[in-house]
Amino acid sequence: MAAAAALRAPAQSSVTFEDVAVNFSLEEWSLLNEAQRCLYRDVMLETLTLISSLGCWHGGEDEAAPSKQSTCIHIYKDQGGHSGERPYECGEYRKLFKNKSCLTEPRRDHKHRNVRTGERPYECSKYGKLFHQKPTLHIHERFHTGQKTYECSECGKSFHQSSSLLQRQTLHTRERPYECIECGKAFAEKSSLINHRKVHSGAKRYECNECGKSFAYTSSLIKHRRIHTGERPYECSECGRSFAENSSLIKHLRVHTGERPYECVECGKSFRRSSSLLQHQRVHTRERPYECSECGKSFSLRSNLIHHQRVHTGERHECGQCGKSFSRKSSLIIHLRVHTGERPYECSDCGKSFAENSSLIKHLRVHTGERPYECIDCGKSFRHSSSFRRHQRVHTGMRPYK
C-alpha cells in the first residue's frame, strides 16, 4: 500500500484518448487495405481499454460527464460508420454508444460503468490482479503464458499487444513525426516525446519514500524500489534464477539459448549484449575514452580504469584467511575458492570442475578441438594464448629468460 501511495502522491497530468490515438481522414481510411484496417481497430480498442482500466483520462476522477476524447472513438467498420454518430445514451452516466447492444448489455459486463464505479470483476488467476474489463485481463494474461499473437511482417518479431506491433512497424517505416523543439530529436510516438522532454526540464516528480531519491518516470521508481524490497519478479524457467528487471532476464536467457544477436561488422564476432559489442569495437577503433586523472593513462573499458586507479590510491581487497590482497574484488572471490575448495564451473562432457569460468572455457577446447590462436607466420594453431606466445618466440628469436 505504501508503494502504491508513493506512486500516486505526485500530481499527474491528465491523459486524453486523443493524446494516444491515431486518427485518419476519410480519404486516408479509403486507402487502407482490410488487414491494415483490422490492425487499426485492434490497436484503438486495446488503447481505449487500457486507458479506461487505468482510470487516467481527462475527467476520469470526478462525476461529471466524460470529455469528448474519452467517449468518442471512431472505429470504421463500414461506410455507415464514417459519421461517428452515437444515438444511444446511458441514462446513468450520459455516455453515448453507436450500438444499442452496448447500452443494454448485462450490468456486470457494462464496461464503462465498471470504470465509473470502480468495480473490477475480472481477476487474474495467477496473481489475483483485478481489472475493470475482460479484454484488459486477456492482454495481461498473455504476459504469463508468453503468448505473442502479433507478428511483424518486416522482421518476424512477435508481440503480446497489437499496439506494440504498430509501434514496431513505425520503426521500420522510420516515420518520426514528433520532434523535440529543444534538441531536434524526433520520435515515433507522442508519449516518447513527452518522456524525452523531462531530460530538458529536469523534472523528477516520483520520489522513493525509503531513501528520498527522485525519478522522472514511475517505471524508474518501481525498478529502484526493488533495491529496498529485494523483489525479483522475473524468473528464468531454465535455471530458476530471478531478476529485478525484465531486460536482465532477457539478456540472461541468451546464456541458455546461445543467442548472440550483436555482431561486429569488422570481424564478424558476435555478442550477447550490445554493451559487449561496443566495448569490442574499441579494439578496431583503438578508442580509449577512460583517462586517469592522475597520470593521463587511458583505457578502453571503465572497469580497467577503476582497477588502474588503485595503483595510485593503494586500495586492496584482503583475504581474511591468509592476508593476501588483490586490486580487484573479483580476484579475491576467485582466490577464496582456494580455501573453500569450491569449483562451481563443471564440464558437461566429462564432469571435471573448475574454480574459474575461464579455466572451464580453456578445458572445453580439449573436447571441441578448437584452436583459436593461429600463427600468421607458419599457420600453426593453439588452444591457449600462453602456448601461442611461447611459439612466436621461434620466429622472433626473443629469449626473455636468461
UniProtKB/Swiss-Prot annotation:
The keyword Protein biosynthesis does not apply. A zinc finger (C2H2-type) spans 88-116, 122-144, 150-172, 178-200, 206-228, 234-256, 262-284, 290-312, 317-339, 345-367, 373-395. Gene3D superfamilies: 6.10.140.140, Classic Zinc Finger (3.30.160.60). GO terms for molecular function: DNA-binding transcription factor activity, RNA polymerase II-specific; RNA polymerase II cis-regulatory region sequence-specific DNA binding; zinc ion binding. GO terms for cellular component: nucleus. It comes from the Eukaryota. It is found in: Nucleus. Keywords: DNA-binding, Metal-binding, Nucleus, Repeat, Transcription, Transcription regulation, Zinc, Zinc-finger. GO terms for biological process: regulation of transcription by RNA polymerase II. Residues 15-87 form the KRAB domain. The keyword Chaperone does not apply. PANTHER family: ODD-SKIPPED - RELATED, ZINC FINGER PROTEIN 208-LIKE. May be involved in transcriptional regulation. Belongs to the krueppel C2H2-type zinc-finger protein family. This is Zinc finger protein 586.
